[in-house]
Amino acid sequence: ALVAFAWSLAVVPTSLPAKAYYEILFWGGGHALQFTWTLLMLVAWLALAQACGGRIPLSPRIVLLLFLVALIGVFGTPLAYLMHEVSTVEHRDMHTWGMRFGGGLAIAPLALAVLLAMAARRVGPALADTQRPLRSALLASMLLFVAGGVIGLAIQGNNVKIPAHYHGCIVGVTLALMG
């Protein structure tokens, strides 16, 4: 992310209006940070589910493979800079596509595995008092992150869906890490 920020700073035309300048300046690095925070959130989801007594129905190898798929978006960041000028729509779309592809392919199966682990957990003994806040953080995180993701899939053009998508996702990440 720091390399992306520095690269943008070096090549963004300073003649752009301030709004466009700063949006372009932080677009690539911001998306690289989003990949990182999303991966940390997924780790937190797995940890929270296990702390609540859930057994994740995926092998460690499959989880690792899903994390590697999610990293595709991060590795695509330098390609966006090498292939397109930073002020082009193609540059911007490449970062967005990376998040949808890399993040989306990993998030869905991991989220489903966590939900299955939590559903199976409901059959066993009741949660201890110390586990209830963990479960609440996990489920609220998943709900908000998925809502933000669904809103993100509906984005077309500049409208209120963009901040709704971003805030849903970032609050989902925050709740997972607070849990």
Task: For the regions a language model picked out, list residue spans one by one.
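Juxtamembrane membrane-water interface segments of multi-pass membrane proteins
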Residues: 7-24, 39-65, 79-95, 112-139, ...
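Alpha-helical transmembrane segments of integral membrane proteins
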Residues: 28, 61-68, 100, 104, ...
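Hydrophobic, small-residue-rich alpha-helical packing segments that form membrane-like cores
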Residues: 1-4, 10-13, 31
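Small-residue hotspots
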Residues: 1, 36-37, 137-148, 172, ...
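Selective recognition of specific alpha-helical transmembrane segments in multi-pass small-molecule
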Residues: 1-4, 64-80, 107-111, 146
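Alpha-helical transmembrane segments of polytopic membrane proteins
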Residues: 27-39, 93-109, 167-174
